[in-house]
């Protein structure tokens, strides 16, 4: 089994396209807080919490292609990631300084990351994105559902060269 971090499909595409180099995490509703359970992992594409207004206009071209990677029937794995650094956010006002490292609007970061579960600290994961040599299609099963950050997948795909 291989660990996979659930991440919005548009962010996975942004990582592979070199437009994003960080992941902003607090943990799912079913978790007390986010833990870096693995430093190398697959990226499991999701769209459950996606809305076009959460992405800055210059990155909205990712939404169409990304939506096809996570359907009711299957998911298409395209990427893995390696954590280069995991940094707790102590000063939320400092998030403006990393705006060019992700695709989210400032309002989305505030509402979906900072204001969500305000007692929990936001983690910024600096990652190296690694495309899979060949995308892997998996049937969607109940084990992949729920509001958790991590799932275990029954695949060990071959990786290509890192994007960044």
Model-derived regions: residue spans:
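Structured alpha/beta reader/binder surfaces that contact nucleic acids or chromatin modification marks
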Residues: 1-164
